[in-house]
Amino acid sequence: FEADRIPAIREMICSDNVEQREKALSKLEPMQQGDFEAMYEALEGRPMTIRFLDPPLHEFVPTEEEDIQLMAKDMGKSVEDIKAIIAGLHEFNPMMGHRGCRLSVTFPEIARMQTRAVIKAALAVQARHPEWTMVPEIMIPLVGELKEFAYVKNIVTSVADELIKEAGSDMKYKVGNMIEIPRAAMCADDIAPHSDFFSFGSNDLTQLVFGFSRDDAGKFLEAYYEKKIYEQDPFARLDQHGVGRLIANACRWGRSTNPNVHLGICGEH
């Protein structure tokens, strides 16, 4: 999110109820729609996958006293109220915390807003360029359980189908999920029949398979290289024996129940 989006995100975070959150999200929706339209235009009809909101909400709130005071003024709340909200967002392990699709489960209005932005952008670009075939691809991050994915996908499809019908369009779209959690990889055969595509998130999958944090592993990995326990940085080169084997098995299991599931990978490897 660019800097001009942050106030609306903070307004959403500070909301006391669904109505207030939806009001804040209504400010974000046209911004996101505009961004998506620009990206669709740049790609000239080529496929584009849009990942739904993934970072934990604490990343959008200030940490410095001066910034906290400014946020309190902007939000019409006391400094103490803002500090209480920020404290409530604190997590001991944010990477494994309230982020990804978990945000859409607890705040389904976020998924509804992002779906509207994606579909309305695609419809607008399709209308301007009838020679292009727009097929929006929506990716749900941090899925670890089929019912979790099904819950969020149902939000997406209900909103998307209504918008497409209202537009009198026959536009198709896809809904898939990231596989970053080992459990999702192990349950790929359960998830695949309900998913149009898998995208293996190699960064988080590596962290969770190895059981160490990318931010902290530098404290001991050099010793592992010196002692030939690891030959290279597992965050720079994908581990073939462990992480790679899990990905290969997940591909096989997923294709066993949905031969047409599209397979991809994203990350820094």
Which residues does each PLM region occupy?
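Conserved alpha/beta-domain cores
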Residues: 1-269
